[in-house]
Structures are given as structure tokens and as C-alpha cells.
From Swiss-Prot:
This is Large ribosomal subunit protein uL15. NCBIfam families: rplO_bact. One of its GO terms (biological process) is translation. Residues 1-59 are annotated as: Disordered. It comes from Burkholderia thailandensis (strain ATCC 700388 / DSM 13276 / CCUG 48851 / CIP 106301 / E264). Binds to the 23S rRNA. GO terms for cellular component: cytosolic large ribosomal subunit.
Length: 144
């Protein structure tokens, strides 16, 4: 067997449908499009969501939600991630260097997901009540 002798398995390939080539083909005259109407014409399709002039669903329903402009500037760090950090003093710069928050991040908040078993000092970061309690229970502290 060689690459130039490879062929698809028998019956794996279907012949292209040749429409509009006489009544003997079974797909002559109307070529599978039926009789008259917009969809039988060339170029005769309406845009997606068009409901024949009726107010479309996406315009009938109210707008909802918004895109926060500050989302990319606020980071979120888990307690479990702080456990893996090689430093004892955690601040925004340490988080950026460790890759836990993005370069554009201007502030970060610690959330109580995971466990913290070692003592750390947190500087200039926010924390949830649960995260603050877990850090202080492990012997850590917050320096503002």
C-alpha cells in the first residue's frame, strides 16, 4: 500500500447532486425547490431572525445586563493559590510576578476557596470575610 494508491472505501463518497438537468434525473425543472415563492427564487432568502415583518423575538424582549468596564482591572485570587506562592509577603506585585493576576490588574481580592496552612502577610489587597478569617486563623495578618 502506497499513498498514491489510496482510495476511499466503497460507498463512502456520494456523487454531487446535479439539479435542474432534465426530468429524467428526478431533480429537473424546479430542482428540489418546490413551486414559486421567495425560497424558490435565486437569492431568495431572508436574514436570520426575520419573521416576515412581525417584530422579531430579539427586539421584542428587553435588554438585560451590562459589560463591566472594570472587570479586566480587578483580579480574584484563591486561598489555595496563596498557599503555593513562594513568598511570605503577598501584594499586587507578587501576584503579578506569580501570574495569578494579569498585567493590567490594578486591584485584587482574596476569596475563601481552598486552604491556607502557612503564615502570610497581606499588603494592599482586599479579602472576603471568610478569606480574612482563614488567613488570621493560620497566623497571618493584614498590613494596609
Amino acid at each position: 500500500m502506497e499513498l498514491n494508491n489510496l482510495k476511499p472505501a466503497e460507498g463512502a463518497k456520494h456523487a454531487k447532486r446535479r439539479v435542474g438537468r432534465g426530468i429524467g434525473s428526478g431533480l429537473g425543472k424546479t430542482a428540489g425547490r418546490g413551486h414559486k415563492g421567495q425560497k424558490s427564487r435565486s437569492g431568495g432568502f431572508h436574514k436570520v431572525g426575520f419573521e416576515g415583518g412581525q417584530m422579531p423575538l430579539q427586539r421584542r424582549l428587553p435588554k438585560r445586563g451590562f459589560t463591566s468596564l472594570t472587570k479586566e482591572f480587578v483580579g480574584e485570587v484563591r486561598l489555595g493559590d496563596l498557599e503555593k506562592l513562594p513568598v511570605d509577603e503577598v501584594d499586587l506585585l507578587a501576584l503579578k510576578q506569580a501570574g495569578l493576576v494579569g498585567e493590567l490588574t490594578k486591584s485584587a481580592k482574596i476569596i475563601a476557596t481552598g486552604e491556607l496552612k502557612r503564615k502570610i502577610v497581606v499588603k494592599g489587597l482586599g479579602a472576603t470575610k471568610g478569606a480574612r478569617a482563614a488567613i488570621e486563623a493560620a497566623g497571618g495578618s493584614f498590613a494596609e
